[in-house]
Amino acid sequence: MTKEEKLARKQQRKAEKVGLGKLLLWNSSSCSVALSTLMLGYATFYCTDVLQLAPALVGTLFMVSKIFDSFTDIVAGFIVDRTQTRWGKGRPYEIFMLFLWLSTWLLFSCPTSFATAAKCIWIFCMYTFMNSICVTFLNANNVVYMVRAFENKEQQSKIVGYGSIFTMAGAMVFNVLFPTAMAKVGTDAVGMIAIPLTAIGMLRILTIPEKFTPVSEKNGEQTHLKDLLPLLKESRPVLIICMVRFVQNIATGLGVGTYYWQYIIGNLGMMGVASVTTILVLPLAFALPVLRKKFGMAGMSVIGILVGCIGYLAT
């Protein structure tokens, strides 16, 4: 290898490098959003056991909210795509992090003295604003922000790949601590973690600017709704992905794990203790790139589904 080739390779590695500090700062927002989403798993339990609302009524409220969410996803994407500010295109929407945790705290702070109708209005408004507005915009801006903060695909791949490890670690810590805190101090646990997680979630908007313009934007390319409709109609893989996400949202939104530990096991605090075992999965995250090369994404998906089914059947 010539001296010029060595220099070129060194410069390439330098261009592809993402420092640990920037990696943590970027994923601070994603981790905060993920933890707020995990907290929604306790919303059904809170509504039925604390507010004494009928399970069928709670399910109906959440179902209507999810239907509304399907429309806000489309609207948020088009709003973000057409944004032009001095802070950039995707970065300004990180401000929804403040409203996300405010609405999360309010969701679990409904006065128990309210009448049933008032409780329903409170829960529906807070749940919808949190999930259908705040989380939607924080998801819609994510890729738009990333491609303007990191210029090359190698950096973007590292941000997504290694960043998921930090998000997974944060979720594990949450799953261990939050059920125990809920068992001891009730819904006050939400307020205890809302402030620090808001601060963590705001690190990205305060430290990482948008510095680059994607090629598609330089060429003046824009996505229109009429371009998406034929894709949904003719592309079978897209329809399959939509169905998978639909089933996934139903399964994750049930929140049955809380009921299982409270009424079958008899101790909600033990849910956090049992979650300690999930730390065994963390080293596997470092092996995912190798496994993905060996089995492919389809093979990895099948393996994950089979392992998940075995786990659910065993419990």
Feature locations, PLM:
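Membrane-embedded alpha-helical bundles of multi-pass transporters/translocases
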Residues: L7-E221, L225-T315
